[in-house]
Regions:
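Conserved NTP-donor binding/palm subdomain of two-metal-ion nucleotidyltransferases/polymerases, i.e.
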Residues: 2-125, 131-374
Length: 374
């Protein structure tokens, strides 16, 4: 039984997606409808991040001069910002390489280079860099010694319950250091084995192969977030189109099964096929929908697609805890779920968990309101 995609774009966001992804006649119609429905000066942040792609898809002649100028400015700003953060990320990758640590660039940066083929159309805030899990401590030490500042006071403790940690450079640019490629922890050995070469800012690294890139985009983008995450749709459609026949669908199904993510993959790919005509083979959808999935996996997927609540927060934390318990990472493990939750939220006492959950929910909703404001 397939699960519906819970976190979908609004009608207005769907229009800007079609303007960014559809062939010219349909894209132009979607753009006109979007302009009639949305005040350009009050565009939500998620839609704003797609406007450089709309500009490239339709071309400057499709807009009146004022709008064309604004869109061109957004594209140039994205291109310039990405060049800067790519250079800083390349510095970090060079530090890791000098320490003998392999790197694999995931998400936005690798998508911009290998799938979009244009670093200006895919805005991003940082660069995601995956290292082998057994080299996590060495990577943190090397980056810290080179002047990169971790976002947490005790980064080694952080690694035991999380999947990534932000680092800020001395100048501009941030990286998100990953030891797991996804929130849902699983072995990334296959990801490394099938990875492809990538050059970022003049430095050699690796990137996920198209099948893995597509699976990561679908799984990472579908959960609810205060900042609308529907950019995953553009990422996934672009990977499918750019990879063409090189996309190994059998691999995608196998990896979704191994990672216990067939429910999320089926929902996301089914939506892309139905709404955007993405070339997802029907047998692939059938295999994903027919794959065995536990009640826990389905419940975690449903919870992830809903707005924040204490129950959702606990369900997702429980999902991460169960998955971590199934892995042999060699790192110390929490004594139980309560200990995991306490360490996950950095609390001194388990008695503070209920209060923290309510406060965290309030803060996250406030951030979402602030980002949505014009």
């Amino acid at each position: 039984v397939s699960e519906p995609l819970g976190n979908r774009p609004s009608p207005e966001q769907l229009l800007v997606l079609h303007a960014a992804l559809d062939p010219a006649p349909a894209a132009a119609g979607a753009w006109r409808n979007w302009r009639q429905a949305v005040d350009f000066d009050a565009v939500d942040h998620g839609s704003t991040r797609l406007l450089p792609l709309v500009y490239r898809n339709l071309g400057p002649d499709a807009f009146d001069p004022e709008v064309a100028g604004r869109l061109k400015g957004l594209y140039r700003r994205s291109w310039s910002h990405n060049q800067l953060i790519f250079k800083r990320a390349a510095d970090a990758i060079a530090v890791l390489e000098a320490a003998g640590i392999e790197t694999l660039v995931t998400k936005g940066a690798s998508l911009a280079i290998l799938s979009y083929g244009d670093v200006g159309v895919r805005p991003m805030d940082d660069v995601d860099v995956l290292v082998p899990i057994e080299r996590t401590a060495a990577a943190i030490e090397a980056l810290s010694a080179a002047g990169w500042s971790p976002d947490h006071d005790d980064p080694l403790a952080w690694t035991q319950v999380h999947h990534s940690l932000g680092f800020a450079g001395a100048d501009a640019g941030n990286i998100d250091l990953h030891w797991f490629s996804l929130w849902q922890p699983a072995s990334d050995d296959e990801l490394w084995r099938a990875s492809v070469p990538l050059e970022l800012g003049g430095v050699a690294s690796r990137a996920p192969c198209p099948a893995d890139q597509l699976l990561l985009a679908c799984v990472h983008g579908t959960p609810w977030s205060p900042l609308p995450p529907f950019r995953w749709i553009a990422d996934a459609v672009t990977v499918i189109r750019s990879a063409g026949e090189q996309l190994d669908w059998d691999r995608l199904v196998a990896e979704a099964e191994r990672r216990r993510l067939t429910v999320a993959a089926a929902a996301a790919l089914g939506y892309l096929h139905d709404e955007f005509g993405a070339a997802v083979p029907r047998p692939v959808l059938s295999r994903l929908r027919a794959a065995p999935a536990s009640r826990h996996e389905r419940a975690a997927f449903r919870a992830a697609g809903r707005p924040d609540s204490p129950l959702r927060t606990l369900r997702m934390a429980w999902d991460r805890y169960r998955r971590l318990c199934d892995l042999d990472t060699g790192a110390p493990r929490p004594a139980g779920f309560v200990d995991f939750a306490r360490r996950f939220w950095g609390l001194e006492s388990a008695w503070r968990l209920p209060l923290h959950a309510v406060r965290a929910l309030s803060r996250r909703r406030a951030r979402g309101d602030a980002r949505s404001a014009p």
